[in-house]
């Protein structure tokens, strides 16, 4: 998962998992047609019960043989997974290919897909009938039954679990900025939630989600996970929904904080910044450098603020933990990972992609703008579906 280039540099793999809503073209109403869409994708697609594990729970040998489309918790959504990539151009092509595959399969089933963090219109989610998902619905009640949310998960290659835990410990203050950039879920059950990312608020209902304090070692990380399992509150270790965690089967760090982005290039930006963070903090660990750990309470407040405001108001500065302008906070993140971006050849593209988001706005801004312009939530969904595959 770390490739050595001819000139002696190394570059980390990066892969993206995205969850997409399945919606009716005319009304924007989410449709419980995951099975039909996934069947329409053709050979290699999962069937309910045969693919109960989430993407990062497949065996390492299946890393490059990803399924075209996969089930998620609810019948009104599906998941797409890119292959591991080593350049942002490659990742962009792969992500667009995956989105196009989902759109074509959805069209065959008489629906479409939309990269939206939550459904703008009212919906009654239907849990996919696998034993694991049904057990989750029974154990967690409305938390599971209402959990129709779509996120973007980024996997970045690491050299060892020790390096991975060191990275997890060091990236925590920076993750709220990624949430603000990706925020794409202002509407919930037909009303404006007043949040840029209400998905993050809904996701926070799980007992094991959110930020983590520094672990300090692989042993402590593993012991913490086991202690959580031992409470018999979670079904299994796959329900350890930290905002960033070690993948169970891949040699990667998985950052799970972002909303799914309407624009594919925004997802590429998020992935590039996460890869830059992983590389930067791995270097800091190797050099014996570390900042004083942020309190989990501070991290939670910073992420709440990012969820509430997105890019439209102040964020929490990850260095001072004081309010600061969103453009200043995003600039701090880019400066923090500057050397890693340069070494990966990502500097110019990241600058262009970030400039586009700051000028255009994130997905939440796009949804509210469309609703203000047209006055109908169905138009919000139609516009998002068009952007998803543009």
Identify the function of each model-found stretch.
Residues 1-105, 109, 125, 203-390:
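C-terminal accessory/tail domains of diverse enzymes
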Residues 116, 120-122, 131, 136-152, ...:
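Metal-dependent DNA replication initiation modules
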């Amino acid at each position: 998962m770390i490739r050595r280039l001819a000139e002696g540099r190394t570059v980390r793999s990066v892969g993206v998992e995205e969850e997409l809503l399945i919606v009716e073209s005319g009304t924007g109403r989410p449709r419980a047609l995951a099975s039909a869409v996934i069947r329409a994708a053709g050979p290699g697609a999962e069937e309910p019960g045969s693919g109960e594990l989430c993407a990062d729970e497949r065996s390492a040998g299946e890393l490059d043989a990803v399924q075209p489309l996969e089930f998620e918790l609810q019948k009104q959504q599906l998941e797409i997974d890119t292959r591991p990539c080593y350049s942002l151009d490659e990742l962009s092509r792969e992500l667009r290919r995956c989105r196009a595959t989902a759109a074509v399969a959805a069209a065959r089933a008489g629906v479409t897909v939309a990269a939206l963090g939550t459904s703008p219109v009212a919906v009654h989610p239907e849990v996919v009938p696998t034993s694991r998902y049904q057990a989750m619905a029974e154990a967690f009640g409305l938390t599971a039954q209402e959990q129709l949310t779509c996120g973007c998960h980024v996997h970045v290659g690491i050299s060892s679990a020790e390096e991975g835990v060191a990275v997890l410990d060091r990236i925590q203050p920076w993750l709220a900025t990624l949430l603000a950039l990706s925020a794409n879920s202002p509407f919930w059950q037909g009303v404006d939630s007043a949040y840029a990312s209400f998905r993050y608020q809904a996701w926070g209902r799980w007992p094991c989600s959110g930020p983590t304090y520094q672990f300090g070692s692989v042993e402590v990380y593993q012991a913490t996970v086991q202690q959580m399992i031992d409470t018999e509150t979670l079904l299994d270790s796959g329900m350890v929904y930290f905002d960033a965690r070690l993948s169970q089967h891949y040699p990667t760090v998985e950052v799970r904080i972002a909303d799914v982005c309407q624009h594919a290039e925004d997802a590429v930006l998020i992935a590039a910044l996460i890869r830059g963070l992983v590389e930067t903090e791995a270097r800091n660990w190797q050099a014996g450098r570390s900042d004083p750990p942020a309190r989990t309470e501070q991290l939670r407040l910073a992420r709440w603020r990012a969820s509430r405001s997105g890019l439209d108001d102040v964020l929490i500065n990850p260095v001072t933990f004081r309010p600061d302008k969103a453009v200043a906070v995003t600039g701090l993140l880019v400066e923090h990972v500057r050397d890693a971006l340069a070494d990966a050849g990502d500097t110019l593209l990241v600058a262009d992609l970030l400039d586009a988001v700051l000028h255009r706005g994130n997905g939440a801004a796009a949804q509210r703008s469309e609703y203000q312009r047209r006055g109908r939530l169905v138009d919000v969904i139609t516009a998002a579906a068009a952007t998803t595959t543009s």
